[in-house]
């Protein structure tokens, strides 16, 4: 009790490595990373005021259903005038802000990234700094939940394919580039780990 009163422990949400097959949290030490060939997609997010758009880069387009912001580096001159503007989240039609955060790398993709606090540890930390909402879009089996709109009930990778088709149909998909990255795997069953709140 004293630790709680001293502010050393607290109760609250936290993001963990989650195995959707074993249905258990996995420590950082138990995650095995494998290099995989994937893709980097550029997606158009239109400004609410109709004056243009910002293009974000992502390796996980299916998680955009839970986006609560777009982030740019505060030193990036390309985006100086759009910090504080709002964009419309494609497919979901939710208004989200463009924020500035030093975590964003100016030379990765377009220099603008989507912030999905319930699906990425870095985004979770950014959400705490900027007091952003956390929208969970997956259940413990990595199936899209009711917050995922048309993708509800779909496995994360089925949802990815359908989200990409919907983005292309709506004119939001700008580009797809080959991209190699490390993917966390469960050390027991080798299933892709899902960051989970």
Language-model segment annotations:
Residues 155-183:
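Phosphate/diphosphate-binding loops
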Residues 193-197:
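Short, intrinsically disordered, charge-balanced linker/junction segments flanking boundaries
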Residues 1-2, 188-192:
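Core structural elements
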Residues 112-114, 146-156:
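The substrate-binding groove and active-site-proximal loops of carbohydrate-active enzymes
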Residues 15-24, 179-189:
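A glycine-rich phosphate-binding loop feature that marks nucleotide/adenosyl-phosphate handling sites
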Residues 142, 163, 185-187:
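Active-site cavity-forming subdomains of large catalytic enzyme subunits
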Residues 1-141:
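NTP-handling and nucleic-acid-processing catalytic cores
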């Amino acid at each position: 009790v004293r630790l709680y009163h001293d502010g050393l422990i607290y109760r609250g949400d936290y993001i963990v490595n989650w195995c959707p097959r074993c249905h258990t949290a996995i420590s950082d030490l138990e995650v095995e990373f494998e290099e995989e060939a994937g893709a980097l997609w550029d997606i158009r997010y239109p400004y609410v005021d109709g004056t243009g758009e910002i293009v974000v880069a992502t390796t996980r387009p299916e998680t955009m259903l839970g986006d609560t912001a777009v982030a740019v580096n505060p030193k990036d001159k390309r985006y100086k005038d759009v910090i504080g503007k709002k964009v419309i989240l494609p497919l979901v039609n939710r208004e989200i802000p463009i924020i500035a955060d030093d975590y964003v790398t100016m030379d990765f993709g377009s220099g603008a990234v989507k912030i999905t606090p319930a699906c990425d540890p870095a985004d979770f930390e950014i959400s705490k700094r900027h007091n952003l909402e956390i929208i969970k879009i997956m259940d413990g089996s990595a199936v899209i939940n009711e917050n995922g709109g048309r993708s509800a009930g779909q496995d994360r990778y089925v949802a990815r394919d359908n989200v990409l088709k919907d983005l292309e149909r709506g004119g939001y998909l700008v580009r797809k580039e080959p991209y190699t990255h490390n993917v966390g795997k469960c050390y027991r069953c080798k299933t892709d780990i899902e960051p989970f709140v």
